[in-house]
Amino acid sequence: MRVLHVYKTYYPDTYGGIEQVIYQLSQGCARRGIAADVFTFSPDKETGPVAYEDHRVIYNKQLFEIASTPFSLKALKRFKQIKDDYDIINYHFPFPFMDMLHLSARPDARTVVTYHSDIVKQKRLMKLYQPLQERFLASVDCIVASSPNYVASSQTLKKYQDKTVVIPFGLEQHDVQHDSQRVAHWRETVGDNFFLFVGAFRYYKGLHILLDAAERSRLPVVIVGGGPLEAEVRREAQQRGLSNVVFTGMLNDEDKYILFQLCRGVVFPSHLRSEAFGITLLEGARFARPLISCEIGTGTSFINQDKVSGCVIPPNDSQALVEAMNELWNNEETSNRYGENSRRRFEEMFTADHMIDAYVNLYTTLLESKS
């Protein structure tokens, strides 16, 4: 079996949650004897297929970009040339140019859409794009959502429930022993009792809510990551005089995992539906940390269950966030219980092996139905 994943960006150009899912699937398939390639776009290179660990990547140099969507006329031709080399083509939605790739090439392979998120922000462009989106989603064989919560709340997915299945995203188990000097460095830098945010600085991440809660509570907060709003968020923290907030910038996995181990709990204040799942919540659960997230009708509340693995609060409510942080800060027994439950739920539902096995079973079923 040969599988092709299609998405707008990939390692090492970007390291977002969708890229992480594609990486896990590609590596996991390779371990199971299934060849996996990634068809993606880059601002500065056109090459491939090139080896990336145990899978391969095909990079297409983008010609221009509109609304965070890269376009390439050469990619249309290239996709048509290679489409018949694969048994399964797994598209990762949303990426509007991908719809054009599919509909122009009409591959004979079985087609799967991993539906990461509704399109939330570009409402005006959505009116132009919607007919193309509907043709694309109607034409594929199967749609995979990451949580039943998202299937129930997505107006788009309601139209395709007859071919939509749920496969939660997963992460590898983590048994790495950390370098004692790095642990000592971070313990000296940020302590070992703080609330941890990890993620891109984007409009839907709720960072303004987190800064407001940090100002009200004066509890220690460590913010890991970067992105389009980084300068704005750092400036706001400085203007508020938030000495209890530490920005680390982007970190490698080892340093990030040390902070997960040192923190009191994970805060995930995303307040808009653009946050479809929440890989950071899985990372926190993997390290048996209590979680704080918002009820936005997506996978965040599938991962984090209120009063079981942490606190689920109303979105865009900094006072509710303060109260949740205080609950974990002032009640160590409760905090530990939530953390144990989050780890148990991770092991039962959210490991990479669970996800990969489910996808391989889906691929196999689709191929058997074709024959």
UniProtKB/Swiss-Prot annotation:
Task: Provide the family line.
Answer: Belongs to the glycosyltransferase group 1 family. Glycosyltransferase 4 subfamily.
Please explain the role this protein plays, according to its UniProt record.
Answer: Mannosyltransferase involved in the biosynthesis of the repeat unit of the lipopolysaccharide (LPS) O-antigen region. Catalyzes the transfer of a single alpha-(1->3)-linked mannose residue to the acceptor N-acetyl-glucosaminyl-diphospho-undecaprenol during the synthesis of the adapter region.
Query: Mind listing the UniProt keywords for this protein, alphabetically?
Result: Glycosyltransferase, Lipopolysaccharide biosynthesis, Transferase
SUPFAM superfamilies given in the database record: UDP-Glycosyltransferase/glycogen phosphorylase
Task: Show the Pfam families listed in the entry.
Answer: Glyco_transf_4, Glycos_transf_1
Source species: Escherichia coli
Protein name, entry field: O-antigen chain mannosyltransferase C
Q: Is the Cell division keyword given for this protein?
A: no
Q: Which domain of life is it from?
A: Bacteria
Entries under InterPro entries matching the protein: Glyco_trans_1 (IPR001296), Glyco_trans_4-like_N (IPR028098), Glycosyltransferase_grp1 (IPR050194)
Q: In which pathway does it act?
A: Bacterial outer membrane biogenesis; LPS O-antigen biosynthesis
Q: Which GO terms describe its molecular function?
A: glycosyltransferase activity
